[in-house]
Amino acid sequence: MSQDTLFDKVWDLHKVSSLPGGSDQIFIGLHLIHEVTSPQAFGALKDKNLKVKFPERTVATVDHIVPTDNQSRPFKDNLAEQMIETLEKNCLDHNIRFFNIGSGNQGIVHVVAPELGLTQPGMTIACGDSHTSTHGAFGSIAFGIGTSQVRDVLASQTIAMNKLKVRQIWCDNKLSKGVYAKDLVLHIINELGVKAGVGFAYEFAGPAIDDLSMEERMTICNMSIEGGARCGYINPDEKTFSYIKNKLCAPKNEHWDKALKWWKSLKSDENSIYDDVVKLNASEVEPTVTWGITPGQSISINQQIPLLDDLSPNDKLVAKEAYEYMSFKPGQLIKDTPVDVCFIGSCTNGRISDLRVAAQVLKDKKVSKNVKAFVVPGSEKVATEAKQEGIDQIFKDSGFQWREPGCSMCLAMNSDKLIGNQVSASSSNRNFKGRQGSPSGRTLLMSPAMVAAAAINGKVSDVREFIN
């Protein structure tokens, strides 16, 4: 009787050969590219007079460096314009599908691929971006890769990798009202640590995971990398299949029937052997906020920032650095911390369901006069849906700026940046020093609903106080 995990099954199906040194050559079913990590890779192909091996398995969009305030071409930022022109040319030269600005399908690569039905169970997916793990929400095995591996996939459709161990993270019960997938994944990272996943793939399972929507599952898998894991995934189910059905690039007619039959066979065996199993009680998770300079430094909304004596020797060093950088004191409550900027967006929380939840909090309320708040839809499709539902108007009426799709302030590789020592309440995925554009800017990670609550009060707040 088979005892394989989904990871084992997908890995074995895509294994081309075993390589000297213990790594495997893995075929990549879908390669996603964008404007930042692809130019050098295409340049390397040109130097060797090579063409893209499987252009039909390669899909491009622009997201990282595009401005969100004004997307009229040419961009004011000459570098941004140059990078997008380069991607346009490379896609044209190699016959690669390119979802450009104005296509109706441009956006953050990890938002666009699922909403188009490109992301499917049983796939291997690679992209020159660490948050490629997002796609594991569909039962695919998805890896972020560096530019040299982007080159390899373009040239051969394969990468060399060591097979990962698999840790199952079992989440019992269900999340309480006012607690979201973002809170759960921040809680998981805090419990296990930011390095616990090194060498692992994370399988998220249990009643709490089953209860999540597909977009919430994407949030969970998106931040696997923040826990040190190379990828994260969830076994596909009826929610997965329903989400994909009738999407632009999903299989149709008899191809759908054939795909569905195969997808339903793709799940970890009941008696799968895992390298490690961790069990958590999701009903105990509360709205969660980061206080430090790693995503693992988080606490519940009513908790105090940890005392040094309560931390392990390794955690103490990072905590001291975080106290100083964030201007927090041990024992201080995170609640009521003043914020200057509120950002809703990113590949973690820039989908339509994220905007809906935040809009419910903001409806008939106003952003604090001391706060600059802006929302960046994850894609043109998300923006269109939001406008059709009147969500954009709720944001505008509250005082949020409504922006165009892009990565925006998640990584500030564009014009959206913190200034000086500003404190940001952000729905993104990383709170490293300088992550949001200012060398001294400070980031507090939280759910979109919590960002909305912070925007209204001008300080870190418990969103449950806004929910009837």
UniProtKB/Swiss-Prot annotation:
Transmembrane segments: none annotated. Residues 424-443 are annotated as: Disordered. Its cofactor is [4Fe-4S] cluster. Pathway: Amino-acid biosynthesis; L-leucine biosynthesis; L-leucine from 3-methyl-2-oxobutanoate: step 2/4. It is an enzyme of class 4 (lyase). Keywords: 4Fe-4S, Amino-acid biosynthesis, Branched-chain amino acid biosynthesis, Iron, Iron-sulfur, Leucine biosynthesis, Lyase, Metal-binding. GO terms for molecular function: 3-isopropylmalate dehydratase activity; 4 iron, 4 sulfur cluster binding; metal ion binding. PROSITE patterns: ACONITASE_1, ACONITASE_2. The keyword Lyase applies. Residues 424-441 have a biased composition (Polar residues). Its EC number is 4.2.1.33. It comes from the Bacteria. [4Fe-4S] cluster binds at residues 347, 407, 410. Binds 1 [4Fe-4S] cluster per subunit. It catalyses: (2R,3S)-3-isopropylmalate = (2S)-2-isopropylmalate. InterPro entries: 3-IsopropMal_deHydase_lsu, Acnase/IPM_dHydase_lsu_aba_1/3, Acoase/IPM_deHydtase_lsu_aba, Aconitase_4Fe-4S_BS, Aconitase_4Fe-4S_dom, IPM_dehydratase_rel_enz, IPMI_cat. Catalyzes the isomerization between 2-isopropylmalate and 3-isopropylmalate, via the formation of 2-isopropylmaleate. Belongs to the aconitase/IPM isomerase family. LeuC type 1 subfamily. This is 3-isopropylmalate dehydratase large subunit. It comes from Prochlorococcus marinus (strain MIT 9215).
